[in-house]
Swiss-Prot record:
Keywords: Lipoyl. Its cofactor is (R)-lipoate. Signal peptide: none annotated. SUPFAM superfamilies: Single hybrid motif (SSF51230). It comes from the Bacteria. Belongs to the GcvH family. The glycine cleavage system catalyzes the degradation of glycine. The H protein shuttles the methylamine group of glycine from the P protein to the T protein. PROSITE patterns: BIOTINYL_LIPOYL, LIPOYL. The modification N6-lipoyllysine is found at K58. This is Glycine cleavage system H protein. One of its GO terms (cellular component) is cytoplasm. The glycine cleavage system is composed of four proteins: P, T, L and H.
Length: 120
């Protein structure tokens, strides 16, 4: 199941673990990323809380926790090579994985069609 937030994050659910990243639109708006700061594994995140930071030559932007849960893994590759997020934001450029407190809460987020129609 793939879902999107109004803050331009995406989540892909596999069991109770969601992979989280920024959308292609967000990556394009930011421009070339030069720095990525990710949450610590084990961090407990609350929906809407700043979970990560992506910084480009134009601006720094918080990436918000899309739902409540605990960080289970981070993508060290994007810390070492932030440009990976620009090249493949919804693939190799994922940011972190989290165990969702309530996986059914994803239903309230936008699906691909709703996100495509969402004003950018």
């Amino acid at each position: 199941m793939l879902r999107f937030t109004e803050e331009h994050e995406w989540l892909k659910l596999d069991g109770e673990i969601a992979t989280v990243g920024i959308t292609s639109h967000a990556a394009e708006q930011l421009g070339d990323l030069v720095f990525v700061e990710l949450p610590k594994v084990g961090a407990v995140l609350t929906k809407g809380e700043a979970a990560a930071v992506v910084e480009s030559v134009k601006a720094a932007s918080d990436v918000y926790a899309p739902l409540d849960g605990e960080v289970t893994e981070i993508n060290e590759a994007v810390v070492a090579a932030p440009e990976t997020v620009n090249a493949d934001p919804q693939g190799a450029g994922w940011l972190y994985r989290m165990r969702l407190k309530d996986p059914s809460a994803m239903e309230a987020l936008m699906d691909e069609a709703a996100y495509a129609a969402f004003p950018k």
